[in-house]
Amino acid sequence: MLERTLRVLEYNKVKEQLLEHTASSLGRDKVKNLVPSTDFEEIVEMQDTTDEAAKVIRLKGSAPLGGITDIRSNVKRAKIGSMLSPNELLDIANTMYGSRNMKRFIEDMVDNGVELPILATHVAQIVSLYDLEKKITNCIGDGGEVVDSASDKLRGIRTQIRTAESRIREKLENMTRSSNAQKMLSDSIVTIRNERYVIPVKQEYRGVYGGIVHDQSASGQTLFIEPQVIVELNNALQEARVKEKQEIERILLMLTEEVAVEADIVLSNVEVVANLDFIFAKAFYAKRIKATKPIVNNERYMDLKQARHPLIDPEIIVPNNIMLGKDFTTIVITGPNTGGKTVTLKTVGICVLMAQSGLHIPVMDESEICVFKNIFADIGDEQSIEQSLSTFSSHMVNIVDILEKADFESLVLFDELGAGTDPQEGAALAISILDEVCNRGARVVATTHYPELKAYGYNREQVINASVEFDVNTLSPTYKLLIGVPGRSNAFEISKRLGLSDRVIEQARNHISTDTNKIENMIAKLEESQKNAERDWNEAEALRKQSEKLHRELQRQIIEFNEERDERLLKAQKEGEEKVEAAKKEAEGIIQELRQLRKAQLANVKDHELIEAKSRLEGAAPELVKKQKVNVKNTAPKQQLRAGDEVKVLTFGQKGQLLEKVSDTEWSVQIGILKMKVKESNMEYINTPKQTEKKAVATVKGRDYHVSLELDLRGERFENAMARVEKYLDDAQLASYPRVSIIHGKGTGALRQGVQDYLKKHRGVKTFRYGDMGEGGLGVTVVELK
């Protein structure tokens, strides 16, 4: 990536802001060395990594990166045999703790179900050196001093030192409190000179105390004397201090050697936490500028939704939708110089640079960006004083360099292309330069105030015009990018707002060709149409999102309903099976009793015994069967029943003989030795009549039964449909269904009306309604049963 491109697009300013979010010099070094990548896979991984760190921040608010310092030079010194200071060793211990703490932090989140595959891979490389960490912290205090407990020998030496110091102070304090002390001493204090305890003695009394003079005051009137009586004690104290120093050095060398043994692991851990500091800095920066993760594609197109420049306050900048690379490869932004065109140009460039650096970009979700091998930018007035180049020449030198290197994997940004020279020649050069880079397949965004380039976008298939909206009422740009609408100068409107007379403005209009006026009017209408279309699109998008939300909610409710329905049906089926099984056992017992009755002399069987047995047999049927009375289709053809016909009673699966018809729908039937009333719908005709045989019931068979939750009438004739509805509702009631659906379709509405007219009269219907969204709407009637 060209250094000039990074400079003019203010990439380093973004890095300066990123630096503010690092926790250590390790992370700061990573930021300082950050440059955009051109490798697609690497960029995707960097974006995913930043996204995981952003997820951690959303869930936890921060990451435990405190206490980590750059200890690499200290570790390398330990590796070559140098002795580390207590503070240097303490920094190593703190960094080891920080890396271990970070590892535990990420692993705990993963254990709790948070998906962080990339960060988990990073922390998996951290090797815990807990033993070494504890050795250092056990020997060195938070203030950087070697503590007494570092070794038994050091504790003993320091006990000796404290004892010696106490004895010396006691003797000297006795001297300062003597009767002659006020006369001979300059001050009644005990002090230290050259690491030995002394007292301040007046010059004329130096011989009274004897001993050694270690210092004197500036005036020479006071001598700091070590009295003879404590010289031996001071000597003993100094010997103990030498031993203390030797023991401390031994401890520090021991710890340094242990660091040297683990040096490679420590350095590896440092590299991991440096990367983690860098990664989380990017995530914190994304939060600061309200950035999101872009979708990175390899198809050479970008779609930036509501893009903002990261260096401009998000509260004041106007976001823009910027698309490039699909329907068109070049955007030519025309309009006046003060219209915010350069901000749009820089927004495109800096977003690409940030994305290719693994940074999230200030756009809305689902924005897409592609990878460019080269990004070229000719922006701003960078004329060279040393080379005595004009503005035009300076730009042209840069453009020549761009034309030598640009290809189909390049993004080229031109600001005020062709400016700084004769307008006619500048416009011609601009068109020629744009043609050249477009023909190479590069993606191009160019700004210009030349009106000649307005037609350029209409004459080239892959080029589109754009402009930055200008509010003539406030005389300022709105910075709203209008794709597909060329810019206009607004000179007449601005002049009128500023007070120029209508007469002068009208004369000015007369100096412009009719075609130019028509073009300006056309552009004005395009701007208005663009704004209206954008407003309509925003409203439609809001409705779409609302519809999707409702759809998701309905899907969730349907899934929950189906799950609950299936659970209840399963429970009901299980209960039904248990009841049927119990009924079978009870029926078998009753049948056994009837067999015993048959074996007995039939004349001796009392009527009440038969009635009781019949009642118990009917009561043995499970509840569902008793409600249904075998609600099944009679597979036999319709037959005019007569007394004496043999039939099969479906409830019990037994044959019987018709005795007499007791009502329009019921017959008296002889089943073995039992006589009972049976509905015609509960019997099946048998072709071969037999004489009634009195025999006991042998078996009672159960029968599977199923009724669908919906009835589909589409394609049925009206009469057949009504008959099916009648039977279906009876079946559904017998199945104890609380709710069913009847599908009649929309069509002409005749079948729908017929169904609902019938439902109004049916005594088993509680309420009914049309289907809701997701249930079939007007093509379905949902029936609530009593």
UniProtKB/Swiss-Prot annotation:
Superkingdom, natural source: Bacteria
One Pfam family of this chain: Smr
Keyword Protease tagged: no
MF terms in GO: ATP binding; ATP hydrolysis activity; ATP-dependent DNA damage sensor activity; endonuclease activity; mismatched DNA binding; ribosomal large subunit binding; rRNA binding
Classification via Gene3D superfamilies: 1.10.1420.10, 3.30.1370.110, P-loop containing nucleotide triphosphate hydrolases
Signal peptide positions (record): none
EC number: 3.1.-.-, 3.6.4.-
Protein keywords: ATP-binding, DNA-binding, Endonuclease, Hydrolase, Nuclease, Nucleotide-binding, RNA-binding, rRNA-binding
PROSITE patterns to which the protein is assigned, alphabetical: DNA_MISMATCH_REPAIR_2, SMR
InterPro entries reported for this sequence: DNA_mismatch_repair_MutS_C (IPR000432), DNA_mismatch_repair_MutS_core (IPR007696), DNA_mismatch_repair_MutS_sf (IPR036187), MSSS (IPR046893), MutS (IPR045076), MutS2 (IPR005747), P-loop_NTPase (IPR027417), Smr_dom (IPR002625)
GO BP term (any one): negative regulation of DNA recombination
SMART domains per the UniProt record, alphabetical: MUTSac, MUTSd, SMR
Positions of ATP binding: 335-342
Domain Smr: 711-786
NCBIfam families in alphabetical order: mutS2
Family: Belongs to the DNA mismatch repair MutS family. MutS2 subfamily.
Protein role: Endonuclease that is involved in the suppression of homologous recombination and thus may have a key role in the control of bacterial genetic diversity. Acts as a ribosome collision sensor, splitting the ribosome into its 2 subunits. Detects stalled/collided 70S ribosomes which it binds and splits by an ATP-hydrolysis driven conformational change. Acts upstream of the ribosome quality control system (RQC), a ribosome-associated complex that mediates the extraction of incompletely synthesized nascent chains from stalled ribosomes and their subsequent degradation. Probably generates substrates for RQC.
Subunit (UniProt): Homodimer. Binds to stalled ribosomes, contacting rRNA.
HAMAP family: MutS2
Protein name: Endonuclease MutS2
Gene from which this protein is expressed: mutS2
